[in-house]
Design a protein with these regions (language model features):
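Helix-loop-beta segment of a Rossmann-like dinucleotide-binding subdomain
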Residues: 51, 55, 79-89, 115-148, ...
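Conserved beta-strand-loop-beta-strand element in the redox core of flavoprotein oxidoreductases
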Residues: 164-181, 186
């Protein structure tokens, strides 16, 4: 019997897989790649919410676990995909500068916000009010990470490339059977695909579509990330990733004319040089209304667990949440209250009246 059957091979799925493997547990992943958000993610990690000058939930702990996780995976796969790089916030007024300095005085933000103005001028970026520097930042090349991790899984017969059908779950006394696979636990790490999961679709996952560009701008001489209303991330060879939009209504992955226009307008607010769009792509982020993840065990079926709702911060959240869920399952350590799906217990009770599956017992 397997220890863990993991549904989904995005950031959440591989984060849990890696934690399980590190603890000598047997795993198998199932994924048909119907969800794209991890693969097209910007990949930035940043401990500060720059719009509101507030600390990301549990940022210090997440950064430690994240760096340990990516160091280990880079070592294992012999590939570099975690790039530590400063993020500069471009200021548009003296007032924005003042807000920055006020925020950097706060005890929880002090480790993350530099108190020195960055006055350096970058070719093709107009910056009369200079920049503030966020510390402990960078980006993960998520597409490369997922591609190489998938190769590793396939080489070790740890990945089934097929759609998962929850109708085929049968419940055993000490786990589940799925088709010809027996496992102690299932981890659902499906991203926005959770809406089709009859065991957890009562949870308020509200996908937010994001669109991004890769642009070519030979005259933009930038070796760090600039963040304003969008981020500009250097990829080498005069290529830059730019994003992202937020659309709460469109739940498709397809790039749109509306998203394209919004990105074009925002880029032109920041850079003054010519550029061409090399690629335009989109994905639906798994976001939750209260901006907290979805982590926990099903109220009735104790072999079913969820790891979802990583939203816009998957590269930072994934490793820490995977560890928290693993510790909960194996060592009965309580899940942080803010992330535990028990906060939606009333929604679960309401769902019992409608469509929660009864489950088959073998």
């Amino acid at each position: 019997m397997l220890d863990y059957l993991i549904v989904g091979s995005g950031l959440a799925g591989i984060s849990f897989a890696e934690v399980a493997i590190k603890n000598n547990k047997s795993i198998l992943l199932i994924d048909n790649k119907s969800q794209h958000s991890s693969r097209v993610a910007g990949g930035l990690y940043n401990p500060v919410i720059l719009k509101r000058f507030s600390e990301v939930w549990n940022a210090k702990e997440q950064l430690v676990l994240m760096n340990d996780f990516y160091d280990r995976v880079e070592d294992k796969l012999q590939v570099k995909f975690n790039f530590k790089m400063p993020i500069l916030r471009k200021f548009f007024s003296i007032e924005e500068q003042n807000n920055w300095f006020a925020a950097s005085d706060k005890i929880n933000l002090e480790p993350f916000l530099s108190t020195k103005l960055i006055t350096k001028k970058y070719t093709s970026i107009d910056s009369p009010y200079d920049y503030g520097e966020v510390l402990h930042t960078g980006y993960v090349n998520t597409a490369l990470l997922l591609e190489k991790y998938e190769q590793y899984l396939l080489e070790n017969n740890l990945l089934l490339e097929e759609a998962f059908d929850s109708k085929d779950i049968e419940f055993l006394d000490s786990g589940i059977q799925y088709k010809n696979i027996q496992a102690r636990h299932i981890i659902f790490a499906e991203g926005f695909g959770m809406h089709k999961n009859p065991f957890f679709n009562y949870l308020p996952l509200d996908g937010t579509k994001g669109e991004l560009f890769i642009i070519k701008a030979p005259d933009l001489n930038l070796d760090l990330i600039v963040n304003t209303s969008v981020f500009i991330l250097p990829m080498g060879d005069s290529l830059f990733k730019v994003g992202a939009t937020y659309n709460w209504h469109d739940k498709t992955d397809a790039p749109t004319e509306e998203g394209k226009q919004e990105l074009l307008d925002r880029i032109k607010e920041i850079i003054t040089c010519d550029f061409e769009i090399v690629k335009h792509f989109g994905g639906v982020r798994p976001t939750v209304a209260d901006r907290r993840p979805l982590l926990g065990t099903h109220e009735v079926y104790k072999s079913l667990h969820i790891l979802n709702g990583l939203g816009t911060r998957g590269v930072m959240l994934g490793p820490a949440l995977a560890q928290a869920l693993y510790d909960h399952i194996e060592n009965q350590i309580p899940i942080p209250q803010e992330a535990d799906i028990k906060r939606f217990h009333k929604r679960y009770l309401k769902s019992l009246i409608s469509d929660q599956p009864s489950g088959r017992k073998k």
